[in-house]
Amino acid sequence: MFIISSKNMLQKAQHAGYAVPAFNIHNLETLQVVVETAAEMRSPLIVAGTPGTFSYAGMGNIVAIAGDLAREYNLPLAIHLDHHESLADIESKVMAGIRSVMIDGSHFPFEENVALVKSVVDFCHRYDTSVEAELGRLGGIEDDLVVDSKDALYTNPQQAREFVARTGIDSLAVAIGTAHCMYAAEPKLDFERLAEIRALVDIPLVLHGASGLPESDIRQAISLGVCKVNVATELKIAFSDALKEYFLQNPKANDPRHYMQPAKQAMKEVVRKVIHVCGCEGQL
């Protein structure tokens, strides 16, 4: 099997003290970049897609192409449902072959979040599918969900322990000051809070909103228990900026096989950097 659960992948990372990158993809080219680069660096890989991504590119297309690339490069990988909110949607995608899920009920009150997440865990674990959930809320934009910075909430460590115990999730996404965007100013992450969560929760922790974070912050978060690092915005910016520059230099260009190459290369450099910072090169 080349499409796998992320559970063992993250447990191995937790034991060895590195993190696995989860790269959000959107189309054929971005999927090619993350798989090819991870294979070159012999890095474990999580390919992430929001509901909008699966709607745009097609669920079957993503699974089929990712599976073909994984076999071509001999690289087992997890296709991960990022920020999914519907049990029915998750059920249909798990039945189509997905084995890694994030159910996001962080916008609900605590008890509703617990109930939703528990229902997803009960279903997914029957199919050897790992489940990530979020407690607390990140600011920024993810698909069509916009969370103003004033509405962002940090994860409560004591509540995190209860949340993990009651839901049975495999990994916990924590809110410690990151956001789903590039940062206008350097963010101040609450590492003390992260350390408190780590002391109370023994499952892998997940850092969302890593685009644009200082490398030192990512490394410190990993040292405090983060085992999965999500990167999306930084990839899109690198890809689109390279496309724009290509057309500025070549205004009459019209062949995707040509203009996609610099965009893929720019994104590849970001992927290489993140793998290096996560410390997962050669960890297959």
From Swiss-Prot:
Keywords: Galactitol metabolism, Lyase, Metal-binding, Zinc
GO cellular component terms listed in the entry, alphabetical order: cytosol
Sites where the protein binds Zn(2+): 83, 180, 208
Pathway in which this enzyme or protein is active: Carbohydrate metabolism; D-tagatose 6-phosphate degradation; D-glyceraldehyde 3-phosphate and glycerone phosphate from D-tagatose 6-phosphate: step 2/2
Keyword Lyase: yes
GO MF, one example: tagatose-bisphosphate aldolase activity
Subunit structure as annotated in this protein's UniProt entry: Forms a complex with GatZ.
Protein name, entry field: D-tagatose-1,6-bisphosphate aldolase subunit GatY
Organism expressing this protein natively: Salmonella paratyphi A (strain AKU_12601)
Gene: gatY
